[in-house]
């Protein structure tokens, strides 16, 4: 008995020693893996060799309860750099490896194929390169292989078909080439195949439908050719079929109607022929997108049977015939886009039954007849575009019922009659375009009640009467075009209240009076009042000097400073007889003035505070106080600043904007500062403004410009900032130095720095701060071309208790969030939109708004034919080694500028994506762990595998890890 007990004890001790040996080896393996990482934020601080350290409690490590073998390694979204160590193959018991959302580079090690128990491998959203190793095919237990959003090259290994349990294969957004291996189509358990955004060629194999369990098939944005297989109707398990943005030709096969997919995306190919009527039998369709092809014939009336379809995109084809009235039966329809075809006939009144319709676009067709009153029953209609047709009749007065409408474009038709007063009751309208019609009568003064209006175009009509003074109430307006009408009378004085207006076109009318009422419109950049009957002097102050003579020609009585202007004509000498009484009055007045001068000379002299930058205009206000916030400004007083800048003389001006002028001042210590003089002399709440400035003075970040001092006065407020010698990003891109080559690495560094500064304001300040005016001119550059945001938080700090919104300041045209017009609120996502426009500027070296073109609209117009990369600045293509990264930054910019704020990423997410693009030899500066995502916001987009019938395609874009997942999808969903 004792002998048996001893044997058992020895066996137990042996097992313990064996377990201790194994566990010791696994801990050493983990430390070996750590050596290959560059732990920027020291997130793996607990991975140490300390004797008391238990690797099973290390961050991201999970162990089996009995053997203590490592079974899961989850290091996702930790900002890890470096490579994946070959030592990972020594962890034989691993069931799951999740390294997604880092900045890992190098190749996937062949040794990963030694993890024989592995079921889940997710290396997505990194910078991994090289081929997909064939050794992965040895992982016979593997169920999920997710390698999307890397830089993998080469063909897809056909040996992946040898993994018997593989359910998810996601290789999207890489640089894979070659054809799709036909053997993959014979994997009966495969449920999800994501291959979008690669360089795959060849045809779509008829064997596709051998994948009897496949519900998600996505090959969007490749270079696939040939036709859609005739047998496609046999793929009865499909829920999502996306073949868009390839080079597919031929007709849409009849058998496609046997599919029961929720999403059918065929847009952006070269498909021809007619739309098969059998598509009208696909009752499960939620999204049908056939746009951007060569489809002809008429729209099948049977599509009206699709009562569960929410989005119908047939635009940019060659469709003819009329719009079927049966479309009015699609009761769930939200988006109906039929624009850019050859449709004829009328808009059927049956469309008025679509009470959930959000967007109706029939622009650029040959439609005629009146615009039906029945559309006023579409009470949720947000956007109506009928531009470029042959519509006649009058503007329906019933449109006043469309209270949700923000965009109304009736331009370039044959519409007659007056502008109905009822339009002024569409309170949320931000764009009203009635141009190029035959509208007559006067402009209703009640249009001045449209407080959210951003753009109004009534040009090229037969409008008479005057410009309503009520237009002065359009405080949000940015563009007004009344040109080429018969408008008379003066330019109303009330227009000087339009502090946000950028464009004003009044040419070719019969206006009289002068242009002095526009002198205070400081943000005005496009002005044309030519060919009217205006008289008087053109103002020389403020911003009128920027306008060319062409803006004023054709006004014989208008006096300007250009050649041949009446100002330069020889003027007749006018003889005036002066009475003795007048001479006596002048003499007495002169004596009084002389007496006042003598009294003033006897008083103690103090340096006068500035007024309009003049040295000879003393005023009676007391000297303002200079509040010092930085040691750089120590020992300075207000009088010092006035003396050093000669009372803010014009010769010290280094820039100006819509609300301020910026001066350069060299301090006593020979260090320069930038002085921003605000135009507003009477802040509504000086005390509140001072409180905000005190708060802003505490904000310090390497990518933010520091506030060094301030001076508040009813004469005008001064803000003192760091002076940055390289000026603004706008100067670098569009200013006198724009001929200078700007390489890709520098652009990426600037984009990353600006994003870090904005992310700090949004996520690390308490209370959080909305910038409200993100634009290239508010991104300054230091001597190393490091980006630093300026002008942040001046208006109002973000109030967390009020839904993080504020309406105090509007942004700049071209950069402003379109959602602002509907809500009158700016949020963090408004800053994200503006930042996206800045990214587009960096990528194209084009201005956000240039003359009458809009950069975002221009980019969007190039997306349908995959021509976006053609917009890239040539300096990028000549200095960037990997144009795939440029394409991804385009994707990121389009994500930032999505119309719906909830679809945009956060600035933390933006910084993480841009950080992943930075060159490994020049890593970005480390950020605090608080500046990274506190926890993974990743939403498992494959979670519907067990219940494929419940797939919700829209939810797939909600994942934090999908910030730049699908180039084509970003384009198609970024509707204007």
From Swiss-Prot:
The active site is at 773 (proton acceptor). It catalyses: L-seryl-[protein] + ATP = O-phospho-L-seryl-[protein] + ADP + H(+); L-threonyl-[protein] + ATP = O-phospho-L-threonyl-[protein] + ADP + H(+). Changing residue 750 to K: Er-1 in strain: cv. The modification Phosphotyrosine is found at residues 721, 760, 815. SMART domains: LRR_TYP, S_TKc. Keywords: ATP-binding, Cell membrane, Cell wall biogenesis/degradation, Developmental protein, Glycoprotein, Kinase, Leucine-rich repeat, Membrane, Nucleotide-binding, Phosphoprotein, Plant defense, Receptor, Repeat, Serine/threonine-protein kinase, Signal, Transferase, Transmembrane, Transmembrane helix. The modification Phosphothreonine is found at residues 645, 823. Pfam families: LRR_1, LRR_8, LRRNT_2, Pkinase. GO terms for biological process: cellular heat acclimation; defense response to bacterium; defense response to fungus; inflorescence morphogenesis; leaf morphogenesis; phloem or xylem histogenesis; plant-type cell wall organization; polarity specification of adaxial/abaxial axis. InterPro entries: Kinase-like_dom_sf (IPR011009), Leu-rich_rpt (IPR001611), Leu-rich_rpt_typical-subtyp (IPR003591), LRR_dom_sf (IPR032675), LRR_N_plant-typ (IPR013210), Plant_LRR-RLKs (IPR050647), Prot_kinase_dom (IPR000719), Protein_kinase_ATP_BS (IPR017441). The chain crosses the membrane at residues 581-601. One of its GO terms (cellular component) is plasma membrane. Changing residue 489 to D: In er-117; compact inflorescence with short siliques and pedicels, and susceptibility to P.cucumerina. Its EC number is 2.7.11.1. Its main location: membrane. Receptor kinase that, together with ERL1 and ERL2, regulates aerial architecture, including inflorescence (e.g. shoot apical meristem-originating organ shape, elongation of the internode and pedicels, and adaxial-abaxial polarity), and stomatal patterning (e.g. density and clustering), probably by tuning cell division and expansion. Redundantly involved with ERL1 in procambial development regulation. Forms a functional ligand-receptor pair with EPF2 (AC Q8LC53). This is LRR receptor-like serine/threonine-protein kinase ERECTA. It comes from Arabidopsis thaliana. The gene is ERECTA.
